[in-house]
Regions:
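RNase H-like, metal-dependent nuclease domains and their acidic two-metal-ion catalytic environment used
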Residues: 1-137, 163-208
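Short, surface-exposed amphipathic charged segments that create phosphate/polyanion-binding patches used
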Residues: 1, 147-159, 177-181
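Conserved phosphate-binding/catalytic loops in two-lobed NTP-binding clefts
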Residues: 134-148
Length: 208
């Protein structure tokens, strides 16, 4: 502007207008999303802490917790114990019903104990895994997952640490966390919470 001597982006007005249009169109969706997160068990800012994967840690226990099928998704959480905390080292969160893919993924994740929460349909798979893995246990499917999720949420916030690097590098790790944060008692998307609460329930009961 020759009068004010201010400079402007060439298409600044258009981009500003576009932002206003997007904000107006997406306002209701964002409000619903925001309110859903606020009501979530983990909705508070800073609910989760992180560990530094670049640091060498001495782990006293290594667990892989598996739920082979929740709403058509296969979930796996690899958690290593460091002192009183548990590092969520890796996560599998994918849409698959392939038994071979599930078995292969489980075998690729190191642990001293593998826990499979499943119905009896998956017992043959568990028996097969026992032939090649150190220790494989079966956990029965929990009848009231919402109660378990609520009962373990404080423990999860206090003792489970996330990997910031994994969040950046792994789409599945990020999708798992998004599912975790989107949970409420009426939602259909409970896969991540079912799996993490199952792991927490086992740790509280047998590893505390």
């Amino acid at each position: 502007n020759k009068i004010t001597m201010q400079t402007y982006e060439e298409h600044g007005h258009l981009s500003d207008t576009f932002r206003y249009v997007v904000a107006d169109l997406c306002h209701e969706e964002y409000t619903a999303f925001s309110n859903r997160r606020k009501r979530n068990l983990y909705g508070n800012k800073g609910a989760f802490s992180y560990y530094n994967p670049g640091t060498e840690y001495e782990y006293s226990n290594k667990i892989v917790y598996v739920v082979p099928n929740v709403n058509g998704r296969f979930l796996l959480v690899q958690a290593f114990r460091c002192g009183e905390k548990w590092h969520l080292v890796d996560i599998v969160y994918r849409q698959t019903a392939s038994m071979e893919e599930i078995k292969s993924s489980i075998k690729k994740h190191e642990a001293s104990l593998y826990i499979v929460e499943c119905s009896n349909v998956y017992f043959p798979m568990v028996r097969e895994l026992r032939c090649s893995l150190p220790e494989v246990k079966v956990a029965k499917e929990y009848p009231d997952v919402d109660k378990r999720i609520a009962a373990t949420s404080d423990f999860i916030k206090e003792y489970f640490l996330l990997s910031e690097k994994k969040l950046e590098d792994s789409d599945e790790y990020g999708s798992f966390l998004a599912s975790l944060l989107d949970y409420n008692i009426d939602s259909e998307n409970k896969e991540a919470n079912i799996t993490l609460s199952g792991l927490a329930y086992y740790i509280i009961k047998y590893c505390s």
